[in-house]
Regions:
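A conserved beta-strand element that flanks and buttresses the S-adenosyl-L-methionine
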Residues: 116
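Short catalytic micro-motifs in class I SAM-dependent methyltransferases
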Residues: 119-120
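A short glycine-rich, Lys/Arg-flanked "PGG" loop and its adjoining helix->strand segment in the class I
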Residues: 130-142
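Conserved class I S-adenosyl-L-methionine
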Residues: 48-55
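Class I (Rossmann-like) S-adenosyl-L-methionine-dependent methyltransferase catalytic domain
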Residues: 1-43, 58-106, 147-210
Length: 210
């Protein structure tokens, strides 16, 4: 996993790096715009939604949500990413913090209609993902959703095939989602495949839950 200084150094070229990978339809960012677009459209179905973005980066998605009337909260590991994102949404509540250690205190005091994470939670181990998702679910409003856009696969076999095809480009420090395995802990998890290596996972909190 990148440390904070490495994340800060990557911040300046992040959007460019993503664009090259997506245009070439290559791992890891094939389908990137469609992933973000799917999450954006889902959030827009609820007017004036309260949204928490985990790993907001340069604010590509978060700023669009902000511009369209959402109340935005966010946490990112990189101080430089926060500096780049904050001017795009001056009234948003953005914090620096390592979410492998959980949410920063001010974010724990809120409930959200949507908690979104795009290409960020793969920095957690599988065990950390399970624990973190359970915590996040408790911070949803009734009827709320966790929306995760990331490198993700329906099966372990599909992941291994992508690893083989990617060769030296594969990042062994990142831990990607395998839906069939995650569903053992979260049977109501939904998955929309976007590209051969990406998709949107959604996990809700029932309207009757309080």
């Amino acid at each position: 996993m990148l440390n904070q200084n490495e994340f800060d150094l990557w911040a300046e070229g992040y959007d460019r790096s993503v664009g090259v990978s997506e245009e070439e339809n290559s791992y890891p960012f094939a389908g990137y715009k469609a992933v973000l677009g799917t999450i954006f459209q889902t959030v827009m179905e609820k007017p004036h939604a309260v949204v928490l973005d985990l790993g907001f980066g340069t604010g590509t998605l978060t700023a669009k949500l902000y511009e369209n009337g959402c109340t935005v909260y966010g946490q990112d590991f990189s101080a430089r990413m926060l500096e780049l994102a904050a001017p795009k949404m001056p009234q948003a509540h953005l914090y620096q913090g390592d979410f492998t250690q959980g949410l920063v205190e001010p974010l724990l005091e809120q409930r959200y209609d949507f908690i979104v994470a795009t290409y960020s939670l793969h920095h957690l181990t599988d065990a950390q993902k399970l624990s973190f998702l359970r915590v996040l679910r408790e911070h949803l409003n009734p009827g709320g959703q966790i929306l995760i856009g990331d490198v993700a696969f329906e099966t372990r076999g599909e992941l291994e095939q992508c690893r083989k095809d990617a060769g030296d480009e594969w990042d062994d420090e990142e831990v990607y989602f395998v839906v069939e395995e995650l569903k053992k802990a979260f049977p109501t998890l939904d998955f929309l495949q976007i590209s051969f290596c990406s998709g949107v996972l959604s996990l809700g909190r029932a309207a009757e839950e309080t």
